[in-house]
Amino acid sequence: MVHERWKTVGSASQLEDRPRDKPQRASCSYVLCTVLLSLAVLLAVAVTGVVLFLNHTHTPGTAPPPIVSTGTAGANSALVTVERADSSHLSLLIDPRCPDLTDSFARLEGIQASILRALSEHQAQPRLDGAPELLDALADQLPRLLTRASELQAECAGLRKGHSLLGQGLSTLQSEQGRLIQLLSESQGHMAHLVNSVSDVLEALQRERGLGRPRVKADLQRAPSRGARPRGCANGSRPRDCLDVLLSGQQDDGVYSIFPTHYPAGFQVYCDMRTDGGGWTVFQRREDGSVNFFRGWEAYREGFGKLTGEHWLGLKRIHALTTQAAYELHVDLEDFDNGTAYAHYGSFGVGLFSVDPEEDGYPLTVADYSGTAGDSLLKHSGMRFTTKDRDSDHSENNCAAFYRGAWWYRNCHTSNLNGQYLRGAHASYADGVEWSSWTGWQYSLKFSEMKIRPVREDR
């Protein structure tokens, strides 16, 4: 219909313009064609916009998009044709008498190709039927995402701070490591110096030991009541020690009553009648750990335990025995592999020169070592007896409390026969039944027995 109207208008214009001159008609035709071409371009752009708008709306995806095409430059052909979804066509025509607009058509075809390409790319993208709901969900998620982003930023700042602190800590540790290495180096030097000093002290002690034996013997001989005794009991049925019991005819080991010179009330003791000729008065025994030896001063002064088993005779009684004559000491030892050793001391006494032996702490006098166990007692000679509640040693600490025993500690010990019964090798240091010269400071012996006997005239 548009085409027919265009023809009618064209015919009328030809009839009316016949009297006019040709230049005027050509000018009008040129203007009219230009206007129509502009309208066609605007219409094509408008149609393209409508198509894009329709593609963005939530319409069912089954209807095909409109098809836009252009015609050729021949007569009676449409400039632009739009085929709608309902198969109807919209055509824009142009008068064939218009000037040659081949370049314009080429530009329009380029525009058409761009529009079609844009439509094709747009249609290739998936349609978002739930776009509003998605936008609402995104709007709901956005605050949480922002909050989480803030939290992550804070965590990142914390991690940076922690990294900085770790760096500072590593620097500090490196400094401490250097300082410790320096201290260890200095300690090694001090240790070497200490070892040399200890070696010098040991050599001096050995020299003093060699020089001190005659002096100790002289002191023991000067003790008024410690002369050599004749055989047999001084007053018939009252033996002063186990040697008197042996000389009275008793040959069996066991418990007997004795009556020392300075202890007329008497007390019972266990007598060893077999070792080295017999006649030994036992004052200490460890054999099974059944008796607690970690006790105080009063218990060690009075004695405790069972005479036929583990026991300590008592400092008061040992003093009474060793002040009535010159005594020798024999120490029997056994480990948990049934190995045995002994230590013998030719001179032994407790509180020999004390007016008040308890006040003086029952000091030890011992000399003249021989045997197979090695000497671990001479270092303690001259020391007072120390218990956990009465400290008489030369250490800053209480050796009895520290090494869980009671002994004539110096600083602190080379033997600890009244220590804990730890049954062989142990991780702790020097707190077992120890005789260091034989088994070291980390082995607790299975058996120990300390016994005394008067020095006989025939020796």
Swiss-Prot record:
This is Fibrinogen C domain-containing protein 1. Its main location: membrane. GO terms for molecular function: chitin binding; metal ion binding. Keywords: Calcium, Chitin-binding, Disulfide bond, Glycoprotein, Membrane, Metal-binding, Signal-anchor, Transmembrane, Transmembrane helix. The keyword Nucleus does not apply. The record marks Y403, H413, Y429, A430 as: Implicated in ligand binding. Homotetramer; disulfide-linked. The keyword Glycoprotein applies. Pfam families: Fibrinogen_C. It comes from Mus musculus. Residues 1-33 are cytoplasmic. It is a single-pass type II membrane protein.
